[in-house]
Amino acid sequence: MTCVLKGCVNEVTVLGHETCSIGHANKLRKQVADMVGVTRRCAENNCGWFVCVVINDFTFDVYNCCGRSHLEKCRKRVETRNREIWKQIRRNQAENMSATAKKSHNSKTSKKKFKEDREFGTPKRFLRDDVPFGIDRLFAF
């Protein structure tokens, strides 16, 4: 089988690979990333390779790493960053719960008024504005 990169006529030497060399694999990743509009590079420091993009039927998956030898290191770094974000979210929720618990025994009459004036049929909010989830950092390209 020949290399799938345009203009290359070399044979693929490794079973299961699509390109003949590592350099051509990065060029293929760059072509796929340009095709779907992804400009992100590998999460590993001083790597500079393009991330892996897997195109499915209706969606495409963008990974944080290029898939070379430091894939496990990148995965651990992303997991620790996500863990820190979730700790911050839980900390903010605990602070909000303690603040509302202090107010709840004094404002029972106002809760009843609020329930009576409540409009039904309004949509629920799925993402809150007042709690920093860190979602913008998770999906930053």
Swiss-Prot record:
Main location, first listed in the record: host cell
GO cellular component: a single term: host cell nucleus
Pfam family, one: DUF728
Keywords: Host cytoplasm, Host nucleus, Host-virus interaction, Inhibition of host innate immune response by virus, Suppressor of RNA silencing, Viral immunoevasion
InterPro entries in alphabetical order: Tobacco_rattle_virus_16kDa
Region entry Disordered, spans: 94-117
Superkingdom of this protein's organism: Viruses
Motif Bipartite nuclear localization signal 1 per UniProt: ranges: 75-91
GO biological process, one term: symbiont-mediated suppression of host innate immune response
Basic residues compositional bias, start-end: 102-113
Segments carrying motif Bipartite nuclear localization signal 2: 111-128
Subcellular localization(s) per the UniProt record: Host cytoplasm; Host nucleus
Entry keyword annotation includes Glycosyltransferase: no
Function field: Weak suppressor of RNA-mediated gene silencing, also known as post-transcriptional gene silencing (PTGS), a mechanism of plant viral defense that performs sequence-specific inhibition of viral mRNAs expression. This could be used by the virus to infect efficiently the host the meristem cells.
Protein name: Suppressor of RNA silencing
